[in-house]
Amino acid sequence: LLAHEVGTGKTLTMISAAFKMKELGLIHKPLFVVPSSLTAQFGQEIMRFYPTKKVFVTTEQDFEKSRRRLFVSRILTSDYDGIVIGHSQFEKVRVSQEREQAFISEKIDELDEIISYAKANDDKITFKQAQSMRRSLEANLETLLENKTGIDEFINFESLGIDMLFVDEAHGYKNVRPMTR
């Protein structure tokens, strides 16, 4: 987490960290997720400091239905030093159905433990909260299993071979709901 003031070099720090890790063989295909309005600017920053690096800066057009196969094949077959993608584009790249199913099932199991604990300790508020969250997750799981999501499954995160994720303005992704009392 880079939480420095504006103008203190977070972008360059992120870029430099990625390329050093790649140079050391720790990673092979880093993905930079940046605000959609800044993808081109971020790509320019990379070229300013690392002009010899091969970087794929995505555009909205790369995610049009007619171009998705080309987009995926470019990432899979080219040896990019980095890939830059906007937040709105990144949100279109789902994890596989199997991974999402496993994640939801794990959360349901965790809630079952919380429900058992709350029931044993007569904690009605926590019990009701956990039951509500569990019902919501079960509905999500059912929708997923019935493949009613309406989402194009052609692109999934695992298929891209990304092994390091750098997220600029990551606060937009921190809305995981913890179970609190």
Predicted regions, residues:
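Conserved pre-motif I regulatory segment
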Residues: 1-3
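SF2 helicase/translocase NTPase motor core
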Residues: 8-13, 17-166, 174-176, 180-181
